[in-house]
Amino acid sequence: MIWKRSAVLRFYSVCGLLLQGSQGQFPLTQNVTVVEGGTAILTCRVDQNDNTSLQWSNPAQQTLYFDDKKALRDNRIELVRASWHELSISVSDVSLSDEGQYTCSLFTMPVKTSKAYLTVLGVPEKPQISGFSSPVMEGDLMQLTCKTSGSKPAADIRWFKNDKEIKDVKYLKEEDANRKTFTVSSTLDFRVDRSDDGVAVICRVDHESLNATPQVAMQVLEIHYTPSVKIIPSTPFPQEGQPLILTCESKGKPLPEPVLWTKDGGELPDPDRMVVSGRELNILFLNKTDNGTYRCEATNTIGQSSAEYVLIVHDVPNTLLPTTIIPSLTTATVTTTVAITTSPTTSATTSSIRDPNALAGQNGPDHALIGGIVAVVVFVTLCSIFLLGRYLARHKGTYLTNEAKGAEDAPDADTAIINAEGSQVNAEEKKEYFI
């Protein structure tokens, strides 16, 4: 009886150990994603294994490897590692047909399995842009289509103009004939203008198989447009006697032909003085007859455009002496005049002398100097009149000749009595002069 109880206990102990061991013997796998044409690594691990065999099989339930023994003749499939705890194999040059569920089997009682799904990404082809025919005229409607095939899952298409993304452009995806990959297309519509000339329109394909390097296609636009014309003067304030250059700045595609210059609707009136060189009109020296409207015309195969410039020739401003110099001229003139009153014979020469410092750098008539000279002449005249009057006043009186001696009312025959000064205090005092 005791022996039977002991046997039963041993049986349950063995069953418990087997159950515990079988719970630790469970294969572990992971799903794998690989780009078409790449290499996939399939790994199966067992934490606790009592020398039980491991096996990998493909979605068609074909055995690939049984422990370290290769079962399927496929040169793309190689053994990476084989042990009681791990069985790893590699599949190179993966194709879309390799995608599916792979099984790792642990041959215990019962057999335990673990699934690993192999996902193969289809790489999109390089995109192509169609719909552009050069050249395009300004104002036309442009329609560009970008298409790419072979992506799995379907790729995304984005549009850019000079690296600036164009938002909200729709795209269409279609399943390919193999029912595994997709063809994606997108159409961009916009109306072109001259600012679009030379712009690079880019179609970019984004896909998880491309990592950080997207597929791109580029189309550089060529837009033809009529010329734009602008006249630029060499000076904003043209003056009489100065040269003037008018530059006709014209832009267009195709490049405009040589520009045409006209004045007031006709030809240039003075070709010798108005020289056209390329896009420039050079007026050698300006005068009042040059006033008018100058027109520059530029023409290309698309059309014609023009610009106008109204020329007004301004007078050269008079260069006058500063007002602070005039008092110094007057002072110098007065000083010279004092010398003239003591030497009348030198008056003509002295009055014509000009102050060289005051007149330095003057080309026109000096009105200030003329006014100073007039003032000197007037001053000299007034001084002469004053001296003459004083002289006559001093010699005022009555004079008698020898013939008047016999007169009855004559005081003395040999004496002439002259009144010295009418304004003196002693009016009776007389002086005698002999003639």
Curated annotation (Swiss-Prot):
Domain named Ig-like C2-type is located at: 127-219, 227-312
**GO BP annotation list:** homophilic cell adhesion via plasma membrane adhesion molecules
What name appears for this protein in its UniProt entry? Cell adhesion molecule 2
Keyword rRNA processing attributed: no
Domain annotation Ig-like V-type: ranges: 27-119
GO cellular component term of the entry, any: neuronal cell body membrane
State the organism of origin: Homo sapiens
* Pfam families the UniProt entry points to: C2-set_2 (PF08205), Ig_3 (PF13927), V-set (PF07686)
